[in-house]
Amino acid sequence: NIINVNSDAKYKDLAALNGSNANQIAIARILKAYYFWIVTDYWGDVPYSQSLKGNSDIAYDKQSAIYPALIAELKAAVAQFDAGITVKGDIIYSGNTTKWTKFANSLRMMMALRLSKVDAAAGKAEFAAALATGSFIDASADNFTVNYPGGAFNNPWFSNYLTRKDQGVASFVTGMQTANADPRAAAFGSSSVGIPYGLTRDLATAFIGANPTWAYVLPASKRAANSPVIVLSSAQLKFARAEAAK
């Protein structure tokens, strides 16, 4: 992997042709922390400290230990960035270490907010520390966005709807939005005709056949073949800061 290749004396000089070894490693560490954050939020206690070493019989780590470890990993990754050659092949930030730093600190803030639900003091302190860096996603130009050119690499929602016609916005949601004249409705789905919740696939297929304007998830502009996917945005960070300020 990127970290091993850029750390191994036999390969690091060759790897450096694609950018600073330190910066390649730092970016990989930030992404690793992000993915393990998703994993532990889904499944709680998971293999972490002994993972990615080629062993299958490894211990599970407590989520209470994983969160601080991920935050520490993000801090260490940011500290590792240097002024070396710009990393090539970076499809997110084109090797821009300032933007990667903003993403890392933004992840710290998001993690800290969730941590505060079980350890208020630790979560508050970590959020404040990340905020104090002044380097986090605060404008849409800094959003963590995955771009899809179409063709062999399509937006996942576009690919999903090539074969699935039974997934849409639930009628409970569209009903609430309609009843409250919710101006955000258009951002949730393609129409106000929601699918009744809990249908089997056959019943859902029958419903959408009888209701051709049923509500796809997201508006069409967000699920075209080449529509980008925003993973973490300045809007999310603004909501996080508002929640932390309560």
Residue map of PLM features:
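Structured, solvent-exposed acidic/aromatic patches
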Residues: 1-246
